[in-house]
Every structure is written in C-alpha cells, then in structure tokens.
Regions:
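A residue-level marker of the well-folded mature domains of exported/periplasmic proteins
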Residues: 1-151
Length: 151
C-alpha cells in the first residue's frame, strides 16, 4: 500500500454521509489509480460506496470500514463494500454488565479475568489514570455473514 501523494489527503466526514460521499468522489476523480478506502467514522463507508458506485468503480475499488449491518447490508451484498468492522453491542454490553457486577461485588479486576462473552474470556487491563478493560471481540461482516445480524 502506498499513499497517493506525499501528503495525506483529508477525507474527514464529520460523521456526515454527504461529506464522505463528496470527499470520496473528489479523491476518486483526482486519483484514478486509487484502489481502496478505509472508513473510520460509521458513515464513511456509506459515502465511499455511493461515490464508488456512481463512478462505476465497484470492481476497482475496495472499501472496508466501520459501520452497522443494517446500514451497510445493501452495499455488502452487492459487493461494493468488502467488509464492515465493528463490535457486537450485545456481547460488549453483557461483558460490561458482568464487569460492573464484579466491581460492585468487590471482586478484584485483574489481567485475564473472564467476563463470560466471546472475545472477553481473558481481558487485558490497561493501567493508568483511565484504567481500561480491553476485550478482543471484533466482528467482521461480509457477504457470508451480514444477514446473521440485525441492528
């Protein structure tokens, strides 16, 4: 992978699909060799998908990013978006409820503690002023599994 020029292009969407669409369209027109997008905001890949389809580049441009199954389903199923990355909010919620229960019960929260959900069986503790509990439960949606999720 290489940058398309010596400066990193700004495609900040400010969480707006229309802005992501306009930025993606600008980048695609200015850089015909552009091979892919990755979106960090939840709406980025929607705008990128719209621009890619409009310009007839779905077979040339790969799109991967953050989103939800219901918002991205059409684009994933038609092949415009290659993968959607996220966390299952239900699993994360159950894990955090288990963590809250353990804290309230006075249990010691230590490295490797099991919070009873896939990806949270052996969490990592990040020490510091804002102590964090980190799980490892990415959910990668593609044409094979996107219909398994409805949110």
């Amino acid at each position: 992978m290489s940058l398309i020029n010596d400066t990193v292009p700004s495609a900040e969407s400010s969480e707006k699909v229309d802005t992501a669409y306009e930025k993606a369209k600008e980048l695609l027109k200015a850089n015909p060799e552009l091979a892919g997008f990755t979106g960090a905001a939840s709406v980025d890949i929607l705008g990128e998908a719209q621009a890619t389809e409009e310009l007839g580049l779905t077979d040339k441009v790969s799109i991967v990013g953050v989103g939800t199954p219901n918002a991205t389903r059409e684009y994933v199923k038609n092949g415009t978006i290659d993968a959607v990355c996220l966390w299952d909010p239900a699993s994360a919620g159950y894990a955090m409820c288990d963590l809250a229960y353990k804290v309230l019960a006075g249990d010691e929260i230590t490295e490797g503690i099991d919070l009873g959900q896939k990806g949270y069986e052996s969490v990592t503790i990040q020490e510091g002023a804002n102590r964090c509990v980190l799980g490892n439960a990415p959910l990668i949606l593609n044409t094979d599994n996107i219909d398994d999720y409805d949110f």
